[in-house]
């Protein structure tokens, strides 16, 4: 952080305290970890440029912001729904996007200077969300007429509400952007198109797989990983626990066999899932600055 910015923050925080004002900070980027501790897995498996980990401030910067007088900070830009707690005591609330897989926004209610409620409002119904679908259909038909493969799924135009449309949009973003740009070749080649039973057999040939593991494939697993990373608790209820248990079966198997480039990647994915599934409350919660804790409501 730049020293003159920290000095300015301290000046504002001191003035707020002197005038008995409640200070809430907003910034384009986060003031604390927003990846639920998953950066170590991301950097090891995918590199330092993935999942915006270069936007994760160092502990020294987070501590400096807190020491300057900021205890509650709202960040944007990353399209991530998350709550990060750092130091003694700074709460970083990442505000979700209105166009993410679970679109939404935050409402902050200040009960008193020490106690605040954060509510996350999700957008399921949006008036006229489909008003441009006719134009999208023309674009799709035009690409087909030219012999080009459309980059997005036509099923999106059958969406009954805005939430469903965003689901399709995010699935296509996963397919055409996230996987090609973020996922190492060994994963793209060996698990993306294999179903769950095949992935388990590839890792541990003697392991027993449930028949239902053939109902999903490696793409679905990566898609769920991206959904959890971006929407956190908001998407947790959309992923069946049975599916998560089957993912864990694969991750556990990877931890029992000899290391290889593929096995190391699967272990890393398991670590990321573990972090994203064990995050701080991020939907509706109370910030208690007096007790230095965040609790779900």
Q: Residue spans of the language-model regions?
A:
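Non-catalytic terminal accessory segments
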Residues: 38, 129-297
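Short strand-connecting beta-turns/loops that link adjacent beta-strands
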Residues: 87-88, 100, 112-115
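Short, surface-exposed coil-to-beta transition loops
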Residues: 101-105
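Short, well-ordered beta-strand micro-motif
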Residues: 107-109
């Amino acid at each position: 952080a730049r020293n003159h910015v920290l000095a300015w923050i301290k000046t504002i925080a001191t003035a707020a305290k002197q005038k008995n004002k409640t200070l809430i900070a907003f910034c384009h980027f986060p003031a604390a970890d927003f990846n639920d501790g998953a950066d170590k897995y991301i950097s090891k498996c995918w590199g330092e440029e993935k999942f915006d980990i270069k936007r994760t401030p160092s502990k020294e910067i987070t501590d400096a912001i807190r020491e300057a007088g900021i205890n509650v900070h709202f960040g944007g830009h990353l399209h991530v729904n998350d709550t990060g707690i750092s130091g003694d005591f700074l709460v970083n609330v990442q505000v979700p996007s209105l166009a993410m897989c679970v679109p939404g926004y935050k409402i902050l209610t200040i009960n008193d200077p020490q106690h605040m409620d954060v509510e996350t409002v999700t957008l399921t119904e949006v008036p006229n969300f489909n008003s441009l679908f006719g134009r999208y259909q023309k674009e799709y038909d035009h690409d087909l007429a030219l012999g080009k493969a459309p980059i997005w799924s036509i099923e999106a135009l059958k969406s009954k509400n805005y939430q469903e449309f965003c689901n399709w949009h995010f699935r296509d973003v996963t397919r055409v952007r996230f996987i090609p740009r973020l996922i190492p070749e060994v994963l793209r080649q060996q698990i993306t198109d294999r179903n769950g039973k095949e992935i388990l057999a590839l890792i541990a040939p003697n392991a027993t797989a449930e028949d239902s593991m053939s109902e999903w494939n490696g793409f679905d697993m990566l898609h769920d990983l991206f959904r959890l990373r971006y929407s956190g608790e908001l998407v947790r209820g959309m992923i069946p626990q049975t599916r998560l248990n089957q993912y864990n079966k694969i991750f556990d198997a990877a931890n029992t066999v000899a290391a290889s480039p593929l096995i190391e990647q699967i272990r890393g994915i398991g670590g990321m899932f573990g972090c994203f599934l064990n995050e701080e409350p991020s939907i509706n919660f109370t910030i208690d600055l007096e007790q230095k804790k965040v609790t779900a409501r």
